[in-house]
Amino acid sequence: MSDSGHSQPNVFIPGRNRRRRWMDQGPPGHLNLSEPGREKDPMLRDRDQDRWEGNEEGYGYTIQKTPIILAKPTSDRTKAATPAAPPPMEKPIVLMKAREDGKPAAPAEGATAPPPTAVAKVEKEGQRPTQPVYQIQNRGMGAAASASGNVDPVVGQAKLLPPQKMKHSIKLVDEYMNWCDSAIEFLLDQTDVLVVGILGLQGTGKSTLMSLLSANSPDDDQRSYVFRMQSQEVRERAGNQTSGIDFFISQERIIFLDTQPILSPAILDHLINNDRKLPPEYNLPHTYVEMQSLQIAAFLFTVCHVVIVVQDWFTDFNLYRFLQTAEMLKPSTPSPSHESSGSSGSDEGIEYYPHVVFVQNKAKREDYCPRTLKQMHTVIDKLMLHSHLRYKGTLSMLDCNIFPGLPYDFIESEVNLFLIPTMESDVDETISRAGTSGIPLFSLLPAYKGHPSFHSLISRLRSQIMSMSRPQLSHTILTEKNWFHYAARIWDGVKKSSALSEYSRLLG
């Protein structure tokens, strides 16, 4: 210190320096109280003294302060890291269960939704989760499902249902030869389908046979058959029951097409006696009836895998002549892809031909004689010798064990022929007289029929038809719905066919 009482620069005063160092630390609120005091810690005291002694430039005292880091408490940091909750929905959507007996009604639309805890409690008690329920079904099945009550009580939608079962046949072509679209409601988008059609003269049992092959049993009531049979009144006036083409699809996804009788005298009589106007391209009623029959036959030869030809006596040569004419007039169809893929371009004209099965209905006992059976096969083979229809090699009565004593090569030229007896009850009348005294026991045995039972023969015919091959009807694989649209185009093409028009002109 000078004589004037002022301190000189660069003069070290221990007491003063220590006092000034602790006075310049800043406000007391920012001190780090967790650290030990600098006065008591010898290491901190020596470091601060070195810093003070090294700063001798200038006229003021410069003190380097220890940096202090300011941080929020842990609880505040946790709250800041939590994201903000999304804004609540303006109007919550509540899925309510349908009201049942003994339970209060559901709240109104504007009522407050129950808390989440209540919903979780209900789900824990066994209620199904409110997830969307999807339905794979056809057009028109949704209304049937809602009408039958198969509705999910949680979401109000129809459950997953099996294909709709048909109880009776519907019209595919009406009596005026117009196409009907109602059958598509029963079809699915699957390709494993078999189409079976039938042709025959009037009163040969076409509808009965198709009902037994599709969904009915001989023991069922004939009034419940899927294809309506000829009633007693219609039979007495020699009329026909089926008009146009009837459609039915079984649970095995097999489509059955029942047709009106070909070359029917009842239809001709109806045209003549009722003064029904003929289309302008036909001049005579019998020409119109024959062309109707040819249109139906040509249509079946194009859209069916199997065509059954029924006759109740052996045999009508006009029937075979009619089949050959329909084969000639059938519309051309593309060959299946598995046949045309490896062939040359010259084979593009190969047409599709279905399997043809000849069914001798109402067969008698003598028709099952091996010699008679062999003659039937020989006659049919010679009549169909030049036909392209697949009339042989796909069905055999010898393979059904109907004639156990005959060898498989007994019939040299075996065709697709099957004999069906008259449908009668298998219970013999003599069984009802079992309690009558004085009757020998051997008389209680059933009478000799010469063939298996009607139930057995129908079952064997059905199994052989179901096991037939299913070639492609067109160049692409068709689903059930694709087949329906394909058949509609074929029917329209048959009605507008130039070949059929030219043939009708030649008939006069």
From Swiss-Prot:
User: Where do the record's region annotations for Disordered lie?
Assistant: 1-60
Composition bias type Basic and acidic residues, residue spans = 36-54
Annotated GO biological process: nuclear-transcribed mRNA catabolic process, nonsense-mediated decay
Keyword line: Nonsense-mediated mRNA decay
InterPro entries cross-referenced by the UniProt entry:
P-loop_NTPase, SMG9
SUPFAM superfamilies, alphabetized:
P-loop containing nucleoside triphosphate hydrolases
Compositional bias, Polar residues, is annotated for 1-10
Summarizing the function annotation, the protein's role is:
Involved in nonsense-mediated decay (NMD) of mRNAs containing premature stop codons. Is recruited by release factors to stalled ribosomes together with smg1 and smg8 (forming the SMG1C protein kinase complex) and, in the SMG1C complex, is required for the efficient association between smg1 and smg8.
Q: Which family does it belong to?
A: Belongs to the SMG9 family.
Q: Oligomeric state and partners? A: Component of the SMG1C complex composed of smg1, smg8 and smg9.
Its name, as the record gives it, is Nonsense-mediated mRNA decay factor SMG9
User: What is the native source organism of this protein?
Assistant: Xenopus tropicalis
Q: What is the lineage of its organism?
A: Eukaryota, Metazoa, Chordata, Craniata, Vertebrata
Gene expressing this chain: smg9
